[in-house]
Amino acid sequence: MKVVLVKDVEGLGFFGDVVNVKDGYAMNYLIPRGLALPATEGNIKHIQTILAQKERKLLREKKKAEELAKKLEGMVIGIKKPAGEGGKLFGSVTPADIVNALKEKGIEIERKNVVFYHPIKEVGVFPVKIRLHKDVEVDIKVDVKPEEK
């Protein structure tokens, strides 16, 4: 029996794939659990429209991420943290610090998008990766200075 998958099924296929399976597997497992639909013309067209909508949404998100990456490229943000003798920080720079510094410049990103190459635990200038989309990443520089007492 031919079915069109409504969800990814391990070992069988991904959303939108039309696969041929045994009748019992389709009728007793895939269809009742909402994993597949019979491969009628109407069901296939419906799934194809959903796939097209998802693809357009992904393209919009990628385009938006690329525009934001252009804004961020080459940017240097300053962060002041309490530091001891020799420039060692009390603690470290966190993704939340980066997000707050960017928010002050009018750029909104989430903490999960900030990727450190290594922990920042001292005063200086360090590169930090901002992952805006699975295909769009940009490096910014973080200038860590000791907080004035």
Swiss-Prot record:
Pfam families: Ribosomal_L9_C, Ribosomal_L9_N. HAMAP family: Ribosomal_bL9. The gene is rplI. It comes from Aquifex aeolicus (strain VF5). This is Large ribosomal subunit protein bL9. Keywords: Ribonucleoprotein, Ribosomal protein, RNA-binding, rRNA-binding. GO terms for biological process: translation. Belongs to the bacterial ribosomal protein bL9 family. GO terms for molecular function: rRNA binding; structural constituent of ribosome. The keyword Ribonucleoprotein applies.
